[in-house]
Design a protein with these regions (language model features):
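Short, charged cytosolic
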Residues: 1-6, 16, 84-97, 251-275
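Membrane-interface helix-loop junction between the first two transmembrane segments
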Residues: 5-25
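Membrane-embedded catalytic scaffold of the fatty acid hydroxylase/desaturase
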Residues: 29-41, 61-225
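Substrate-recognition/cap regions that form aromatic- and gly/pro-loop-enriched pockets
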Residues: 283-369, 373-391
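Juxtamembrane "helix exit" motif at the C-terminal ends of alpha-helical transmembrane segments
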Residues: 41-60, 124-139, 143, 300-319, ...
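Membrane interfacial helix-start motif at the N-side
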Residues: 32, 105-115, 274-294
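Loop-to-helix transition at the N-terminal end of transmembrane alpha-helices
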Residues: 18-35, 317-325
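A membrane-cytosol interface segment of integral membrane proteins
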Residues: 211-259
């Protein structure tokens, strides 16, 4: 949040608009859902790296610096191919579409991380590291560092960086990656070292005469990060069901991203951007009171997330899942309000009903809060549930 605030301050000083309130709330909320999913361990590991090391290791590198260097190279190489697969195959795109859904390019959009990565198969691409006996704990330490090193280059404020452009992934390289211009699309998959794109033919330099246009060719058209996470999957399911071609029912999942059977493409057309330079950013009308209310709700959801972290080891996993699910619903509701659709007025009542049900289930105690704090929090939930009914458009 500090770095995002610094980026916003510098942008304002330079007279550049890099953030929109609704877009930022959507991005930060997406990051929150990803964190909750991770701590609840809602994923299936196809094969673990620890198992690979224990069963196929043929040699053990002794020098620590060599181990760390090899691990970094393997992590980055694996990241390149996972990233490329996520872009190029229909079923895998659903795991990554949330990250590209913003029509802005800023530090907050880096937090748009997936909750739809149900199956984890990354270890399969790390077999060379397992053969050489690189310990699993090295990747456990290196993984978060490697991920954080991908945060800084999601910005429009940093120009090209001289000699570093030939070595590292820079903001310029990653602007290309997030762009939907014909010159840029499906380029620059590298995560730390740009060498992989140059080696495998997917590198594209940012051109001074081609300004990047950000987003996806099939626009998200919502601020709700949970809907965005599963929108592509829902489209695949519908197309697989609706097509009359039995082969297409199966192959749609493994075809290039965006491919649809001919019969459903004609019968059920979907919105696509044919000319990026004519892009009209998703921007439903949001009065100031909508925005203020959604920011308050975001911070309340953040407080609940931290409360869940504090409680995590002191309550049953069933209660952890229940609390996590409620926070997901909470995020779904306040982010939907920013879409300004007629249905948003009933969302507050749903939130109130779920809160009341959980409260009764826990004998009028909100996940370990004192009676007084439960009453205080419940009063806020009641008030915030009624606000959408009376809030003016």
């Amino acid at each position: 949040m500090i770095l995002i605030a610094i980026e916003e301050a510098i942008a304002r000083y330079k007279g550049i608009v890099v953030n929109r309130h609704a877009d930022m709330i959507s991005s930060l909320s997406s990051g929150m859902t990803n964190i909750i999913k991770d701590i609840l361990k809602i994923s299936i590991i196809i094969v673990s790296y620890s198992w690979l090391v224990e069963n196929i290791s043929l040699y053990k590198i002794e020098q620590l610096w060599v181990v760390v260097l090899c691990a970094l190279v393997v992590q980055d190489f694996t990241g390149y191919w996972l990233h490329r697969l996520n872009h190029r195959v229909n079923i895998f795109w659903n795991r990554h579409v949330i990250h590209h859904s913003s029509e802005e390019f800023n530090l907050s959009c880096a937090l748009r991380q997936s909750i739809s990565q149900t199956f984890n198969y990354a270890a399969i691409l790390m077999i060379p590291a397992a053969v050489f006996g690189i310990p699993a704990y090295i990747f456990a330490i290196l993984g978060p560092i490697h991920l954080f090193m991908q945060f800084w280059y999601h910005t429009r404020l940093i120009d090209k960086l001289g000699i570093l452009e030939y070595i590292l992934v820079t903001p310029s390289h990653h602007r290309v990656h997030h762009a939907i211009n014909p010159e840029y699309i499906d380029k620059n998959y590298s995560q730390i070292f740009i060498v992989w794109d140059k080696l495998f033919g997917t590198f594209q330099e940012e051109l001074s005469e081609v300004k990047p246009v950000y987003g996806t060719l099939t626009p998200a058209s919502t601020w709700n990060p949970i809907i965005i996470n599963f929108k592509h999957l829902w489209q695949l399911l519908k197309d697989s069901w609706n097509t009359k071609n039995l082969i297409d029912k199966l192959r749609i999942w493994f075809m290039p991203t965006g491919w649809r059977p001919d019969d459903v493409k004609l019968k059920y057309p979907i919105e696509k951007i044919l000319n990026p330079y004519d892009q009209k950013k998703y921007n439903p009308y949001n009065p100031r009171n909508f925005v203020i209310f959604s920011w308050i709700e975001y911070f309340v959801a953040s407080a609940m997330m931290f409360h869940l972290f504090i409680l995590f080891d002191n309550q049953t996993m069933n209660l952890n899942y229940l609390y996590g699910a409620y926070i997901f619903v909470y995020i779904f509701i306040y982010s939907s309000i920013l879409d300004n659709k007629k249905s948003f007025k009933i969302y507050g009542l749903i939130k109130l009903f779920l809160f009341s049900s959980i409260l009764l289930y826990q004998n009028v105690s909100w996940f370990g809060l004192s009676f007084e704090m439960t009453i205080l929090f419940g009063s806020y939930i009641l008030l915030s549930s009624l606000i959408p009914i009376f809030i003016n458009k």
